[in-house]
Amino acid sequence: MEIKEEGASEEGQHFLPTAQASDPGDCQFTSIQKTPNEPQLEFILACKDLVAPVRDRKLNTLVQISVIHPVEQSLTRYSSTEIVEGTRDPLFLTGVTFPSEYPIYEETKIKLTVYDVKDKSHDTVRTSVLPEHKDSPPEIGRSFLGYASFKVGELLKSKEQLLVLSLRTSDGGKVVGTIEVSVVKMGEIEDGEADHITTDIQGQKCALVCECTAPESVSGKDNLPFLNSVLKNPVCKLYRFPTSDNKWMRIREQMSESILSFHIPKELISLHIKEDLCRNQEIKELGELSPHWDNLRKNVLTHCDQMVNMYQDILTELSKETGSSFKSSSSKGDKTLEFVPINLHLQRMQVHSPHLKDALYDVITVGAPAAHFQGFKNGGLRKLLHRFETERRNTGYQFIYYSPENTAKAKEVLSNINQLQPLIATHADLLLNSASQHSPDSLKNSLKMLSEKTELFVHAFKDQLVRSALLALYTARPGGILKKPPSPKSSTEESSPQDQPPLMRGQDSIPHHSDYDEEEWDRVWANVGKSLNCIIAMVDKLIERDGGSEGSGGNNDGEKEPSLADAIPSHPREDWYEQLYPLILTLKDCMGEVVNRAKQSLTFVLLQELAYSLPQCLMLTLRRDVVFSQALAGLVCGFIIKLQTSLYDPGFLRQLHTVGLIVQYEGLLSTYSDEIGMLEDMAVGISDLKKVAFKIIEAKSNDVLPVITGRREHYVVEVKLPARMFESLPLQIKEGQLLHVYPVLFNVGINEQQTLAERFGDVSLQESINQENFELLQEYYKIFMEKMPPDYISHFQEQNDLKALLENLLQNIQSKKRKNVEIMWLAATICRKLNGIRFTCCKSAKDRTSMSVTLEQCSILRDEHQLHKDFFIRALDCMRREGCRIENVLKNIKCRKYAFNMLQLMAFPKYYRPPEGTYGKADT
């Protein structure tokens, strides 16, 4: 049968089309017995006695792995090893792994083709289609040596699952050496036998022993189906590296997309639409306004309706992306995808070493949250928000200025009103239901809940802002006289002006009006409390006459006003409902009047914010929503993964509900040209994540995707866990305690643009961000040390000298050293030791991010797992040349080249430079 070769533009990592995978003919093939959610097959390679085409030539060899699919008998290039230089007996550190979803069977044939690489600068894994058994053209810098093939079943059924195959030339005749194929099972003891293999690396002999001890489970495998509902399209790579005592450790590298890339933005946009529609309706219901304010309202509503329509259009377009879980870097300027994070992936390294427990290291890689479609001509959010607020503070007489704090407070009170009013109505109805049943215990419990919610309701209106807003709205009514331009006055609601210039204090400018009766609001507001007291007194009286227990079990205010109880006439027992009903009706009426007045006044506050500088203020809101959406999608992904991997760690769970989690972002953006605006966007987007809290709930169905509730000032992300996992949580978390995160950002530009910024430009933005976020990190550490139990802290301090690390980080931040990447290394180390969530970001999370995460992985292997010092650079090159990150580049731009040139790399720190042959001109 003729075998045809398919192009490998995806290098075999994107699985075959569904139609092929589900072909009815598949049933005749034998599936591989496998552990759920684990790779189906992993093996390592070594060659011996290779014959050079030219006498005395030292070979630089690599092996290309191809798969012959039994259904169509087509051949697909799958992966390659690294290049091993200067030996005829190469032992390859890069293995081969087939993920759990890959369509592979015992009948599947694997072809191994060995090449001699003559020029690494021109070599990369080919993506073009070449005829089978044809030597590569000489211009790509390598020549064909030999090939061998085997069926997967032959390997699995062989003795010790090891095959030694002869390598033959293209005509199948001459033997040019042998190749060993050995199955790898992460974490299994290899029958206690050692496989001594000698390799010649850079002229040094190194005897390597391949043996591993039995591992402990890295993460509960029961949790993996839950994680797989969030992660998609895994790319897996396998390595073996020597330790300092010449034993093998094995590393599995994995990169996965997340369906949260699209799910979270859609959830968030839906909330924005709901919130904005509600706000627009409240503005319409402000009542009659003077011509000046009415014209402003009409203008605001016109623009706000346009904004809602735009959000609805974006949501419609996103809803069409039903199968998407990834936004490529080349789509970062696409308007319909601007809410979606760029190139979001989980980058995971699993380590199995001879003497240490198995370990997982996760980093979320994502493009810097930024509004690429809107551009950066005028800067990013940090600059734009500051400029907008300064101009609004100095606006003319036609507006009333409210500080950002008071505008946020107005939104908070409005949100509380909308939540509490229906709750109070529900508890009031439950109280009446208890009364109709003549149940004293039920009556007391219902009263307690009603009292608690009503007290929260009354407390929401204690803020002076409500009073000032009522006055402002009064002057905006027809006949309201605004005698002079608003002038700042001191008021108790003002925030501290210490962060503002003396001449630009953020004081609200509220008009005065002599005819306004301020006491009227006090009377309306107080009526709610009085109505509640009457209900409490009545319940006390009813229970007392019924011979119930003393006291209402609710609020003690009834004891302070005995006259209320004394004034209640005696009634028969069967009249409980009739006696409480008019009091409940009065409470609802009083509450309705308060809600109506407060809603209108606080909505008028929001009108001031919107009325100024239309449509610029709405465009700022859009920009902030876009950036926040990208940041939140990454955060939710990181939180779920961290929860899954640490679910059975009591210390982590205690930290989660006692302190919260540190979320550390590593930025690699320069402070030059457009990337300044990106960094300004990113800084605000990450800071806004403080508004997010998490709540873990039990999943009631197979749908475990997170749900978001709330509004722009405060969001709650509900993470669903299957019942078995949910039961393992501490009581505080199971009862719904909100879990908080502490986001911090440290940025160090590393490219040639940063060189220009350091020599001819300004790096103050980077310095300010790093200093501000160090203070946030230090504050988290202080809370951590105060709130965690003493026995935990004692053990923690024995294992980690975090105080010294923080001091070192501060010194590096203050040192003003150019491209001081030690800032990032220290911040990442501190984050890991604090059980935090790690992020690495550059413009598109493709090139600079790849250099950073691979360096971090190899540094961890060296510092934590005793990677042999002579193999550090080689391990780094393996991961960059044949690892997950080069696959990431391919996914994004359909080209297996990091987008660097030689001139750019001269400006990069030494260990951030990719190996020769992996970079060059690429369309990004």
From Swiss-Prot:
Basic and acidic residues bias: start-end ranges: 1-13
Q: In which pathway does it act?
A: Signal transduction; phosphatidylinositol signaling pathway
Q: For the C2 domain, which residue ranges apply?
A: 23-165
Q: What class of enzyme is it?
A: hydrolase
Gene3D superfamilies, per database record: 6.10.250.230, C2 domain
Q: Which PROSITE patterns match?
A: C2 (PS50004)
Question: InterPro entries from the entry?
Answer: C2_dom, C2_domain_sf, INPP4
Query: Under the GO molecular function aspect, what terms does this record hold?
Result: inositol-1,3,4-trisphosphate 4-phosphatase activity; inositol-3,4-bisphosphate 4-phosphatase activity; phosphatidylinositol-3,4-bisphosphate 4-phosphatase activity
Query: What's its EC?
Result: 3.1.3.66
- Which UniProt keyword terms apply here? Hydrolase, Lipid metabolism
Catalytic activity annotation: a 1,2-diacyl-sn-glycero-3-phospho-(1D-myo-inositol-3,4-bisphosphate) + H2O = a 1,2-diacyl-sn-glycero-3-phospho-(1D-myo-inositol-3-phosphate) + phosphate; 1D-myo-inositol 1,3,4-trisphosphate + H2O = 1D-myo-inositol 1,3-bisphosphate + phosphate; 1D-myo-inositol 3,4-bisphosphate + H2O = 1D-myo-inositol 3-phosphate + phosphate
Return the annotated region ranges for Disordered: 1-25, 481-516, 546-569
Instruction: Quote the cellular component terms of the Gene Ontology held in the record.
Output: cytoplasm
Activity: how regulated: Strongly inhibited by inositol hexakisphosphate.
PANTHER family referenced in this protein's UniProt entry, alphabetically:
AGAP000124-PA (PTHR12187), INOSITOL POLYPHOSPHATE 4-PHOSPHATASE TYPE II (PTHR12187:SF3)
What does the UniProt function comment say about this protein? Answer: Catalyzes the hydrolysis of the 4-position phosphate of phosphatidylinositol 3,4-bisphosphate, inositol 1,3,4-trisphosphate and inositol 3,4-bisphosphate. Plays a role in the late stages of macropinocytosis by dephosphorylating phosphatidylinositol 3,4-bisphosphate in membrane ruffles. Antagonizes the PI3K-AKT/PKB signaling pathway by dephosphorylating phosphoinositides and thereby modulating cell cycle progression and cell survival.
Family membership, please give it.
Belongs to the inositol 3,4-bisphosphate 4-phosphatase family.
Protein name (Swiss-Prot/TrEMBL): Type II inositol 3,4-bisphosphate 4-phosphatase
Which species is this record about?
Pongo abelii
